[in-house]
């Protein structure tokens, strides 16, 4: 991806929300492993996403439907990122947040019409930027 880890991480000076490829770039910059999804490509399909209620998922239900369009996934995260959302049934990482800085990523597409709670995730990010 031609990633510059310093630019992406920004050392917390600029809040960052990575969606899909952006999530992958954030995680890769932190030393995560990216691979083809073990379940094959998922394009335009709603998936069940479970979360731990932290970061972007604050005050959301523990499970919701979100739209995915991707064939690559983060298998494990680096030292600074903490997974906080997973695909129901598979456990694939669907979201992660930085331990110290306002840096968040989601594998799914909250901006999609097929993601009913997507706007709440965007609003949570904006509130985390304050």
Where would I find each of the regions flagged by the language model?
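Cysteine-nucleophile active-site neighborhood
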Residues: 1-59, 65, 122
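Hydrophobic/aromatic beta-strand patches that form the interior of the parallel beta-sheet core
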Residues: 17, 35, 67, 84, ...
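Catalytic beta-strand/loop cores that center a nucleophilic Ser/Cys/Thr
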Residues: 54-100
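Short helix/strand-capping connector loops at secondary-structure junctions
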Residues: 100-110
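Histidine-centered divalent metal-coordination motifs
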Residues: 20, 70, 109
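Conserved hydrophobic/aromatic beta-strand scaffold that supports enzyme active sites
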Residues: 46-48, 93-95, 105
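Acyltransferase
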Residues: 113-130
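Short histidine/acidic/glycine/proline-rich micro-motifs that form metal-
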Residues: 73, 111-113
């Amino acid at each position: 991806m031609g990633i510059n880890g310093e630019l992406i991480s920004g050392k917390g000076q600029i809040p960052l929300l990575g969606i899909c490829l952006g999530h992958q770039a954030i995680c890769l910059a932190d030393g995560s492993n990216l691979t083809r999804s073990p379940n094959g490509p998922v394009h335009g399909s709603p998936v069940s996403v479970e979360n731990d209620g932290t970061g972007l998922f604050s005050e959301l239900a523990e499970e919701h439907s979100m739209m995915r369009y991707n064939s690559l996934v983060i298998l494990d995260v680096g030292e600074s990122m903490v997974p906080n959302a997973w695909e129901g049934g598979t456990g694939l990482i669907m979201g992660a947040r930085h331990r110290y800085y306002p840096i968040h990523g989601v594998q799914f597409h909250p901006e999609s019409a097929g993601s009913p709670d997507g706007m709440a995730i965007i609003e949570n990010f904006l509130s985390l930027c304050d």
